[in-house]
């Protein structure tokens, strides 16, 4: 029976942050933010993809497939778009095989290639309505669950606030297979994805890495934005349920309570 416990907290980030794998254009800014996509002279550029993953793999289900881990994560991000009417393309928190590499940019968010089914589970924060047949985004901008596909399995409308810090809570109960995700602005405006029942064993290998991926527009240089992660907490184990893990993490950062 697996008993692994993973727990980490980044109150802020430092350049060449230990325990973080940087992929693509991801860097840490001088202000301690994890910036996933590229900037030039402080402004975002198009055709950028960046990802950042924690170096320690997570044992998401045991080798006998009899038990699935619980996890809880909290983080905040800020997106800056020079033109709020030309945002693209968004960012995501994701779980993927330990050796996973960046994929296609634009609406694929660095997580998938065109026409691909892949062992990736993600919660996306989508800032561009892409009607590509693969993606088929709903109107309006949204939070979505990606389960082995860039086409969201479920979505909830999201009113994006430019330059505002969004705090996100994502939990997964390995017993009930329930995944929940909520985004909050200023402790007052909430956007919650309807609870999704998904068995991670159907999509992922038993060991995964967790992290973030983001992309800017692929074809028009005006559809750009920055994607900054401000802090990140994560905990997973087989014994404690997501509510208990959440209490553990709010003990680390009382501002999340």
Where are these predicted regions, by residue range?
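Polar, low-complexity loop segments and adjacent catalytic/binding residues used for recognizing
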Residues: 1-257
